[in-house]
A protein has these predicted regions:
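C-terminal auxiliary extensions adjacent to catalytic cores
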Residues: 1-21, 25-32, 36-44, 70, ...
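Residues that scaffold, gate, or flank divalent-cation-dependent active/transport sites
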Residues: 7-42, 46-53, 57-95, 101, ...
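Short loop/turn hinge sites at secondary-structure boundaries
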Residues: 19-20, 47, 80-83, 108, ...
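FAD-binding core of FAD-dependent oxidoreductases
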Residues: 51-73, 80-103, 131-154, 166, ...
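Generic short alpha-helical segment signal, independent of protein family or function
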Residues: 62, 78-85, 98, 102-105, ...
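Short gly/ser-rich anion-binding loops that grip negatively charged ligand groups
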Residues: 63, 83-87, 106-110, 286, ...
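FAD-binding glycine-rich core of flavoenzymes that anchor FAD
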Residues: 109-137
Length: 488
């Protein structure tokens, strides 16, 4: 997979961070690495004041570094900021951060030594992953997490995990992989540590997970609509044109396509004049969720292909300047927004499960119990659905903000973007489980109703039934639910 600093997407990130894909640098990316490093070398040679290169960091930004300090400042930068606290982040999250950092190096703004950038790439390709604690970033760059990653990658300390999940001292793991870290020069320590790539990487994984969650929501909402015997008029394109939300129209189009061939597409075959909101307004809620996710994807894609460096090299201007690009309010706010969209979709999903379980509303056996056996059917699963929804709603609460107390008042703002992105990703995972529960309920309702399904919903029903047979007698369903998560 070739990185170029411009075209990394959430779906590509999710793939390369998990499946062992080797990364390469594009020719133009290599050129940008060399050109940006030349600007840094010139600033050092001429002792031009550059934050974190020829001066100290944070509250020491006005202090010039001596010649003696310059030689070891990159190592000192990593050693002094490697404080990320356990529990450790999942391997995929750290590898996502590594991939984003490699990609953003190629913008030319970091000024990192090409040898250091290539060493990080080789460590990634060797399947080695730093052990990085999940606590330590406030979203004004992911400094402590980045330092922990950088120190391990350079063999200065910490631990690396290999493809077989064996954990070793970083220096030992590099030696076993026949990798020799290059010497760090000026700016290199800060380039490895001071960036927002953990936040962007986590958010990229969250968007990829949320896309799967939302597509599942849409498909299973259509199956529930069929099982319920819903009134199709709220999905009519002429009705939706009265309020021109494009995402609503797209969701409705996908649901109508899934229902193609159903007798319910003729409103005369609906069982009710007006359905419960969870059925009637699925399009509006899922459309709003899709819009929030689209905005998140746009912001995250920008962040994964942009510099979050401070300072940053302006290659064409031959300058190094201070920036605010390490600060990530766009990322934090859009992750909060998208998580709320998932919460809204999941809330209606749980409501539809309850409606499908109601004999009064569906005409089907209470709690979808098989009438020949005499069990409580899906009644216990309603508790599970609400438990999952409670967890998701908690994750979807906006992340709190306050004035930061860092750097003696110089660094007095934060975003907590990483926490927002982490919550967003976990919310998407819970959303997929809630949808799996709805899938089981909808499949059971379709079986009990006994009507032929349209072609695409018949395929979906068959996929569900391939991993979770029709529920007749009581049986544990936890394993079924996890299997359904994957097939839908």
């Amino acid at each position: 997979m070739e990185l170029n600093g411009r075209s990394l997407s959430p779906d590509i990130l999710a793939s390369v961070s998990e499946d062992g894909t080797a990364l390469t640098f594009s020719p133009n990316g290599k050129t940008m690495l060399e050109r940006s490093r030349a600007v840094i070398d010139k600033a050092v040679a001429e002792r031009i004041p550059v934050y974190g290169v020829t001066t100290g960091l944070g509250s020491r930004a006005t202090e010039a570094l001596s010649a003696e300090e310059l030689s070891g400042f990159s190592v000192e930068t990593l050693n002094g900021r490697d404080h990320a606290l356990a529990p450790a982040l999942p391997r995929q999250v750290v590898r996502a951060a590594m991939a984003v950092r490699l990609n953003t190096f190629l913008t030319g703004a970091a000024g990192v030594s090409p040898a250091v950038a290539d060493h990080l790439r080789l460590v990634f390709n060797a399947g080695l992953t730093p052990v990085v604690g999940g606590w330590g970033t406030i979203g004004a760059a992911d400094l402590l997490l980045g330092a922990t990653m950088g120190r391990a990658v350079m063999g200065l300390g910490g631990q690396l995990v290999d493809r077989n999940e064996r954990t070793s001292a970083a220096a030992d793991a590099l030696a076993m992989a026949d990798l020799t870290p290059p010497q760090l020069g000026p700016r290199d320590g800060l380039a490895l540590a001071n960036h927002a790539c953990f936040s962007a990487g986590m958010a990229g994984l969250a968007v990829a997970e949320a896309r799967r969650a939302l597509e599942s929501h849409i498909a299973i909402a259509a199956l529930s609509f069929q099982a319920f015997g819903g009134n199709v008029t709220p999905m009519d394109s002429a009705v939706l044109a009265l309020k021109s939300h494009s995402h609503d129209a797209r969701v409705a189009g996908r649901m109508r396509a899934l229902l193609d061939g159903s007798d319910l597409l003729d409103p005369a075959n609906a069982r009710r004049l007006q359905d419960p909101i969870s059925i009637r307004n699925a399009v509006q809620v899922l459309g709003a969720a899709e819009r929030s996710l689209a905005e998140a994807a746009e912001v995250v894609t920008i962040e994964m292909n942009a510099s979050s460096d401070n300072p940053a090299v302006l290659v064409d201007a031959d300058r190094v300047v201070s920036t605010g690009n390490y600060h990530t309010p766009h990322l934090a706010l859009t992750c909060d927004y998208a998580a709320r969209g998932l919460a809204a979709a999941a809330t209606l999903s749980v409501a539809r499960i309850a409606k499908l379980c109601s004999e009064r509303l569906t005409g089907l056996p209470q709690y979808l119990a098989d009438p020949e056996v005499g069990t409580n059917g899906f009644a216990p699963l309603l508790k599970l659905a609400e438990s999952l929804l409670g967890g998701l709603q908690h994750l979807a609460q906006p992340t709190a903000l306050w004035p930061s107390i860092n750097a003696d008042g110089v660094e007095d703002g934060l975003t907590l973007a990483f926490q927002s992105a982490r919550n967003f990703r976990e919310a998407a995972k819970l959303g997929r489980r809630i949808t799996a529960l709805e899938a089981l309920a909808a499949a059971q309702a379709c079986d009990l109703r006994g009507r032929d399904l349209p072609h695409r919903l018949s395929e979906l029903q068959a996929a569900i039934r391939a991993v979770s047979p029709r529920i007749r007698e009581s049986r544990p369903l936890a394993e079924d639910i996890e299997k359904v998560v994957e097939v839908i």
